[in-house]
Amino acid sequence: MNTGKQFEADFKASIPSDAWCYRLKDSAATYYGGNESLSFSIDNICDFLVYRYPMNHLFELKTIETPSIPLEKVFGKYDKAKCKYRKEKHITDMVDAMGYGGQTAHVIVNYRAVNRTFAIPASKVLAFRYNESRKSIPWQWAEQEGIEVKAKRLRVHWRYDVDGLLKRLEKENDNGM
């Protein structure tokens, strides 16, 4: 199992029992190296939908071996002719979803080089793309702009404090943040 799929499996195993979690299926294009010419391929907004009363959360999970995640890893390949990233619409759709009450949208980045994981609001990830000159998001920026998701290493796998993340997001929603 590749590291991305393992991160997703560990994240899903960390979901608290009082939350509903659904993993949106990857398209066939994903399995064929991002082949965009496949007909009828699914193009999902995010990786996971997590619902715990009274909130719904959209999570896109990314893992990277380096201390900085390239924008192409978040937004897909850059199309010079169109001056945009191939999957940029996913993040803009997540930002649109954030506009509805009781709903959040985050890009969760696992920086394996520093063993830290952060849930960054999709709106801040999109703002980084347009306002920063960097081509990658360093973990220090994620620490400043996101919420750290604490992790505990088991023998082989990891458990993430998803319950703590959901509680924090619920509290921020209650406070109107």
Residue locations for each model-derived region?
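Acidic-basic catalytic patches of nuclease active cores, encompassing PD-(D/E)XK
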Residues: 1-41, 176
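Short, solvent-exposed loop/turn segments at secondary-structure junctions
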Residues: 29-32, 66-69, 115
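Beta-rich catalytic cores
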Residues: 44
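Conserved catalytic cores of phosphodiester-cleaving nucleases, focusing on short active-site segments
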Residues: 48-50, 55-67
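Mg2+/Mn2+-dependent nuclease catalytic core
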Residues: 64-93
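Nucleic-acid nuclease catalytic cores
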Residues: 92-127
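Short, low-complexity, polybasic intrinsically disordered segments
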Residues: 122-156
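Charged phosphate-binding loop/patch that engages nucleotide di/tri-phosphates or the phosphate backbone
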Residues: 142-177
